[in-house]
Amino acid sequence: MFRVTKEIHFCYGHRLLNYEGKCRFLHGHNAKVEIDLSSESLDHRGMVIDFNDVKQVLQGWIDSALDHKMLLNKTDSVIPQLNSLKEPIVTLERNPTAEVLAQMIFDYAKSQGFPVTEVRFWETPTSFATYRG
């Protein structure tokens, strides 16, 4: 089995509902995402996949869908205020935890036909969540 990893960085804000710690307040993170792609064999170029293809599609989607956006649970009471300020918001069915965001990125990569096997979502330099399909 061959495996390659593409690393992507972006910034986002969020807060967690029904949470007692500091993350119940609006705050931001500098995220790092590691996307593992695997194959039993290599293509005619000797690659699992071209890193540039992964960058164009996945970095492009992350830049447009998540980067410098406020990621919030769709029931968050702060949404109307942020909308009135024309802040960029992405609403999710669940709390925007590292676990949920890892799964979201995994699912998008899979939907684009990439042979993704694992996504690691680093919320801080010392804390990450992993989602495997």
Stretches found by the model and what they are:
Residues 1-133:
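Charge-rich, low-complexity N-terminal segments
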